[in-house]
Amino acid sequence: MEKKKVVLAYSGGLDTSVAIKWLQEKNYDIIALCLDLGEGKDLAFVKEKALSVGAIKSYMIDVQEEFANEYALMAMQAHTLYEGKYPLVSALSRPLIAKKLVEIAEQEGATAVAHGCTGKGNDQVRFEVSIQALNPYLEVIAPVREWKWSREEEIAYAKENNVPIPINLDSPFSIDQNLWGRSNECGILEDPWAAPPEDAYEMTLALEDTPNKPEFVEIGFEAGVPTTLNGTAYPLSELIKTLNALAGKHGVGRIDHVENRLVGIKSREVYECPAAMTLITAHKELEDLTLVKEVAHFKPMIEQKITELIYNGLWFSPLKQALHAFLQETQKNVTGTVRVKLFKGHAIVEGRKSEYSLYDEKLATYTAQDEFNHDAAVGFISLFGLPTKVYSQVNQKKVEA
């Protein structure tokens, strides 16, 4: 019987390594796909590990710049903070992973793709909805969801099949990381009352260990895209990495969040997003300077919907594409520089400037240079308040009657 091909999203961890053996038993030839999203793994080792476990082919693709420009950038411009706190670290990477799975499957003539998600997380939804949107004819296999093993049973299976056991397997935490940040759950973090231990963090320093002097960074934007730090130009992926180090040193971007998952449960997670939180803060301030009032007040409603769509795995939905078009239109004049003070866990904007600034000091000042027409206020107030005045007059007459 001829074997079918499956492309597996491979991380190098226990679950996806065991999945290779499990899929082999189901008569599949496995093609492993590992993406470099800026998480800092030894990806050459991961690529070779897939082959040693049993994959017939192993891909390692650097997608850092694509992730930065096509995914993280939109999240920053839309100020995506799920439930007001979480900058969608993991949710942003899933549609890109799904896209690459489909591309390699089509290139290799595979009939299926596979992922290592469990049956109680959001990621299974994000992967499978994205894959269906890109190629509805591919079979999607979720080995971890299907085999329903305990951790002990999985380890026993790995030992029986000579699958290497990761040396960090005794770590209580489940970690996901990319350019945009780091998420951490499980272990002691499952108790929402327990304080996160310091070893739960990696990208940021504890406030007690941060410098006692602030550091200032000037972030330059061109049409809504961060392009420079302190006058030095960077590709977006490198700018994010550099800012992660700068802001992380000052403890910026630590988030402890109990969130409402798509699958109906609450989960407690700890996030580290130093660059993401700094960029979102700076970008919002530059928009305040350059967007007209109507757009500035309407845009948060669009941002909320974009955030929900991304969190819920609907990156490739028609609505998300339509809202992205609106978002891009708003960014044409978001050009300028924002000065941010990094200090003791805070990213504080202390200055902003733009050639497209709608702030006119001669209109805003209370000095002798004031050019605002104060006399125009009388007529404006009369017309602006007219509906309220008429309503009051009508209802007072009824009371008197």
Curated annotation (Swiss-Prot):
L-aspartate binds at residues 118, 122-123. InterPro entries: Arginosuc_syn_C, Arginosuc_syn_N, Arginosuc_synth, Arginosuc_synth_CS, Arginosuc_synth_type_1_subfam, AS_cat/multimer_dom_body, Rossmann-like_a/b/a_fold. L-citrulline binds at residues 86, 122, 126, 174, 183, 259, 271. It catalyses: L-citrulline + L-aspartate + ATP = 2-(N(omega)-L-arginino)succinate + AMP + diphosphate + H(+). CDD domains: ASS (cd01999). Pathway: Amino-acid biosynthesis; L-arginine biosynthesis; L-arginine from L-ornithine and carbamoyl phosphate: step 2/3. It is found in: Cytoplasm. One of its GO terms (cellular component) is cytoplasm. Signal peptide: none annotated. GO terms for molecular function: argininosuccinate synthase activity; ATP binding. ATP binds at residues 9-17, 116. Keywords: Amino-acid biosynthesis, Arginine biosynthesis, ATP-binding, Cytoplasm, Ligase, Nucleotide-binding. The keyword Nucleotide-binding applies. Its EC number is 6.3.4.5. One of its GO terms (biological process) is urea cycle. Homotetramer. PANTHER family: ARGININOSUCCINATE SYNTHASE (PTHR11587:SF2). Belongs to the argininosuccinate synthase family. Type 1 subfamily. This is Argininosuccinate synthase. It comes from Bacillus anthracis. The gene is argG.
